């Protein structure tokens, strides 16, 4: 059963889908009155609905059954530097949503490159990823903020992934398999070129746990997937399988440079 998005979904009653979603239901999927579809509101409410009417290419549906889902625990908060290349940034947001990230905080670091902020487009990306992955919740997206502000406001267990080997002399990085996936966690990924050494030191001094994603140097969006996949199944074997599946399915859509 296909999943569609309707932000104002209620647990019962009838409603009319947006013009865009109606077009997908009627003209793309060619549903007819009497067909059943699934509707999500991005806040945990999921409803099985019956298509009751099609008028002027707008679809009216009636809720047959609904259930309110709580956000799955543990929650993962992603703090990541925005990317200069818009398509790579949007790809990152899409895959983070598919992997079930709870919150995304764009943090502005010393090496963050110029970026553009397109919130309405990001909302559409989140909705599409939610429907595709059959998830029930949209991630929270914060406005971009300086790293110092994020550091002052964050109180979760934080892992900062970096590749500065010189910092290991003071506080060695732990490997992915040593991450604690049993509680709410924040994962920090820096910009292209990594965090500045002084930023790493401030984060570690403030309680962040330095993390290694392996011997290879990864682009920001790849590092995000590698880190988030650790939380998907709670074990490296399941996380690795999930990461492999995601990378294979995304290969044709990932922007290449």
Give the location of each predicted region.
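Glycine/charged-rich beta-loop-alpha catalytic/anionic-binding loops adjacent to active sites
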Residues: 15-17, 73-77, 183-186, 205-213
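Active-site/ligand-binding-proximal alpha/beta "capping" segment
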Residues: 160-200, 208-213
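Residue-level signal for inorganic ion chemistry
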Residues: 34, 96, 126, 203, ...
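Structured adenosyl-cofactor binding patch, chiefly the S-adenosyl-L-methionine
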Residues: 197-240, 246-247, 257
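RNA substrate-binding interface of SAM-dependent RNA methyltransferases
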Residues: 68-160
């Amino acid at each position: 059963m296909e999943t569609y998005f309707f932000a104002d979904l209620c647990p019962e009653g009838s409603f009319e889908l947006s013009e865009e979603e109606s077009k997908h239901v009627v003209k793309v999927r060619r549903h007819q009155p009497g067909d059943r579809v699934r509707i999500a509101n991005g806040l945990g409410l999921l409803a099985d609905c019956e298509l009751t009417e099609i008028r002027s290419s707008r679809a009216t549906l009636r809720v047959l059954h609904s259930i309110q889902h709580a956000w799955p625990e543990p929650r993962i908060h992603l703090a990541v530097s925005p990317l200069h290349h818009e398509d790579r940034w949007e790809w990152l947001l899409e895959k983070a949503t598919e992997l079930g990230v709870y919150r995304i905080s764009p943090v502005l670091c010393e090496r963050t490159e110029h970026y553009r902020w397109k919130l309405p487009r990001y909302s559409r990306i989140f909705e599409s990823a939610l429907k595709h992955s059959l998830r029930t919740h949209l991630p929270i997206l914060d406005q971009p903020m300086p790293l110092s502000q994020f550091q002052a406001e964050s109180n979760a267990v934080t892992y900062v992934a970096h590749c500065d080997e010189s910092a290991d002399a003071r506080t060695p990085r732990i490997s992915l398999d040593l991450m604690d996936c049993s509680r709410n966690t924040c994962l920090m990924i820096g910009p292209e070129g990594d965090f500045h050494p002084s930023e790493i030191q401030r984060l570690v001094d403030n309680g962040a746990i330095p993390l290694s994603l392996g011997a290879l140097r990864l682009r920001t969006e790849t590092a995000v997937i590698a880190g988030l996949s650790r939380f998907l199944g709670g074990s490296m074997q399941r996380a690795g399988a999930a990461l492999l599946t995601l990378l294979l399915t995304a290969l044709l859509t990932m922007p290449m440079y």
